Amino acid sequence: MKYILLMTGMKVGVESYLAWSQKDRDAHMAVLDRIARELAASGEFVATQGLAGPQEAKVVRGEKGGMPVTDGVFPESKEFLLGYWIVDVATPERAYAIAGRISAAPGPGGMPTNVPIEVRGFASYREPKS
């Protein structure tokens, strides 16, 4: 079953990753790259992508008379989406284990980032009729 692993971060201090030392950023990305390679080798990897910061986000709603576009994530939101992974695994427990490894990737000084990761299964639906 496919799962999406949604990585979230706090809006406060959103630029903190850029303040990390190059050594810490390299170590963090090396762990995430290793996890991605391992998942690809096992056939469980589908996709991963980091996202631009909340200052670049737009919200679009299809409303009567047009599609208004507003800036940013919802103002009342304290967290924002950092990025995601999509995995195709046999059990929810396997998805949880992968999320735990991603969350434990090192941050400054080698300490785990403990980024919250929401794990959600893909909904099943019927294919549209031709």
Identify the role of each PLM range.
Residues M1-S130:
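Conserved, structured core segments of small domains
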